[in-house]
Amino acid sequence: MKNNLIILLILLVSFSCDQKKDNTNESYDLVILNGRVIDPETEFDDIANVGIKDGRIVAITKEPLEGTESVDATGKIVAPGFIDTHFHFQTPIGYSLGLRDGVTSSMDFEMGCAGSYIADWYEARAGKTQANYGIAVSHEFARAMFIDGSDGADYLVNGPIAAYTTRAKTGWSQTRPTLEQGNAILEELDKGLQAGAVGIGSTVGYMREGVSSREMFEVQRVAARYGRPTGAHTRYTLGNDTQENNGAQELVSNALALGAPAIVLHFNNSGWRLAHQMIIELQEQGHNIWGEIYPYAAGSTTINASFLEPESWID
């Protein structure tokens, strides 16, 4: 195998520096030799050899290993692949670029895909990438379907890209649904979870006027029935340090009341230290609450997002 990889990534395997170090006489399917093995979970960091059999790591050791195939990782880092929970570029070329950046599992827990098209979304990607992939069912697209009348397999099956069409209208963002519309939105989310969505993705921060606190709670309740997370671009983002944390607290308090997981998306805005402290302390108490950050200050979005309105904009 080629040995000129910049970063060598191991996919869907569990790392442990205590794993079967004495099995150095085994025959392995693949051995990775002389690399700097780093496991963030166990804090293992040393030059070592890795033995893989039947798709799993069975040895991490300084002893010599032999296998059917070998990779000389001298001067390289051997580490688990990254899981990106906020990956919108879910196309073959997007996955390919992600793999080159170390992302072996690409998920979209923010925008997602319309529930009625989740099965088609997965089918369109089957066998076409080496990456792991998944997508949430979209709160925003459910609102667009039943408030604005957006529908069409030609674009809604495309997940986040569909926003270029649905956001031409404004009901998805600004309108409170009727009782009938609200129930239809929840049914659409349930349909997506039944079809394999990894959770619910909500862009409530784009829909702060249209989505009531009751609606957000009921959206998270749907995910809770399946034990799956709701990821949210939280309400009041962009906002000041108090508003940002109030948005995170809405998502988290709903999750705690429902006994459900939650992901506070890109919480590194104003007041992020409090959001981080809240997440860490809840994790220490055993709650499945987590968050993500991005390494950049801002990204592009559609001009009719509610937080870009002059009365809402925060410099």
Residue map of PLM features:
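Short active-site segment of divalent metal-dependent hydrolases/proteases
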Residues: 89-90, 236
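Histidine-rich, glycine-flanked metal-binding segment
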Residues: 22-32, 37-79
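Metallo-beta-lactamase
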Residues: 81-88
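Divalent metal-coordination and catalytic microenvironments
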Residues: 35, 50, 55, 75, ...
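Divalent-metal coordination cores built from histidine and acidic residues
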Residues: 73-78, 93-202, 220, 283, ...
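Sec-dependent signal peptide recognition
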Residues: 2-8
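C-terminal motif of bacterial Sec signal peptides marking the signal peptidase cleavage site
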Residues: 14-16
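Histidine/acidic residue-rich metal-binding segments in metalloenzymes
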Residues: 176-203, 208-315
